């Protein structure tokens, strides 16, 4: 059960903060961290005896400065809370200054594979023939195509696929159950129809090869153990370096890049189809095992392709993802 933390807002901003937080939670956002930062802003407003809700640059002068010993991420969180509230106030006819200062730590730009890169990568994965004469290496070479498709087609995490148990895969319904994933979350992952058919054929082949149904859905060289995460990292790098695209890419992708690609492709499709992504992100965050929709938004904000789609939908961009174009 979700626990919402509420605070005793008291300043001239109080009614607007309460309405804003309620609106965000109605959309599925937990908003506990931001509500706390807004409480601090409320106290700041009260302590400075500001008797109106209009946010101005002068009133925020002290607020945007770093506090003694404060990290950049904490400072950025405070400024971000004021920025979000200022946007909300402007929407409701209360003219306010929107701070655009970003002081948070730099995040590396994630390389999301485009269609050409994906085609090249999966071509290498599907055609790979081990140099080793070890039969288990040949078996694992047939496991990799399925594993990497689960990353891209279902947005699963590396360790979730590696440690997948046979009992967690419902082949009839095409549902994968993730137990105790990141943030101690359980969730259901629904496979697309064509991937479900591919996974069923893979499992039938695996049983014939081993002569029994294994405990692990992707057994390692020792079938009693699953393929380790570091092996997938290494194999992905090997496959990527075989592609022509790798020669022209400054930021090498990782298996996790396929999860990012899943998010970007899905959200881009929704935007181009005119679907309200604020609503759909609630479901996407559950599907991905994120703590809340904000975390899924963060995935989308990190990538170059987001800018291309947002610009194509320029008339709706400020409502859809208001901060993307400002970064």
Protein language model features and the residues they cover:
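Conserved catalytic core of the tyrosine transesterase superfamily
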Residues: 1-327
